[in-house]
Amino acid sequence: MTTLDLTRAELALIVLYLNKAEARDKICRAIQYGSKFLSGGQPGTAQTVDKNTSLARKVFRLFKFVNDFHGLISPVPKGTPLPLVLLGKSKNALLSTFLFLDQIVWLGRSGIYKNKERTELLGRISLFCWLGSSVCTSAVEIGELGRLSSSMKKMEKELKADDELYRAKLQKSNDRTLALIKSSMDIIVAIGLLQLAPKTISPRVTGAFGFTTSLISCYQLLPSRPKLKTP
């Protein structure tokens, strides 16, 4: 391939990536938490960017609760242990509730819904739902990693480490490990936003962890590169 062809291919991937509403949301999330880290909770330009970006992001999430509600009522893969099923459904229910309540919070903070006290209350409830969903996600990923590890050990004993199925399981294990790291860090972000441990998890710590998980989310949404044809 020529340099021009490679450039076109790279630009096509960028366009594909930026066409995803979820990707744009996560880029804005990185800006939001990066600003929170810079402001350290103190008034100024960085804090203004943090608050404005947070409000703008809520528009990306309008009706997004339908996705997790669909996951809640969808059947699970056969052979999934009951504890993992319950944790997965709990995650879907909590995340769907968070996203639904977040719409009301957006209405309140944009001035459409006038009850400020109820808006703040629903905002805290929604964050607790997100905290709970992050805990459930971490537990699910730990359980699934255990299942993958057991399956891979059996394959290693059968001397099939070079098998395509083994490599696919290894990639899946890596993906779940990254998801576990992200969800564990999101727990800290949620605790910081709720100010449950203000002495330990300051706005700057919350911003640092939020910025990191945003970058992880951006990475997870990257489109796979097409295989290049060799001459």
From Swiss-Prot:
Q: InterPro entries of this UniProt entry?
A: PEX11 (IPR008733)
Select a single GO molecular function from the record's annotations and give it: identical protein binding
Q: Which residues form a coiled coil?
A: none
Which tissues does it occur in? Expressed in leaves and developing siliques.
* Induction description: Up-regulated during sensecence. Down-regulated in seedlings by transition from dark to light.
GO CC terms of this entry: cytosol; mitochondrion; peroxisomal membrane; peroxisome
Spans within the Lumenal topological domain: 109-202
Where can this protein be found?
Peroxisome membrane
- Set out the biological process GO terms recorded for this chain's protein: circadian rhythm; peroxisome fission; peroxisome organization; regulation of peroxisome size
* Topology of this chain in the membrane: Multi-pass membrane protein
Domain of life assignment: Eukaryota
Give the signal peptide range.
none
Q: Which residues cross the membrane?
A: 92-108, 203-222
The residue spans the entry assigns to the Cytoplasmic side of the membrane are as follows: 1-91, 223-231
- Provide the function of this protein: Involved in peroxisomal proliferation. Promotes peroxisomal duplication, aggregation or elongation without fission.
Name the protein family: Belongs to the peroxin-11 family.
Further remark = Can complement the yeast pex11 null mutant.
Q: Which proteins does it associate with, and in what oligomeric form?
A: Homooligomer. Interacts with ARC5 and FIS1B on peroxisomes.
This chain belongs to which protein, by name? Peroxisomal membrane protein 11E
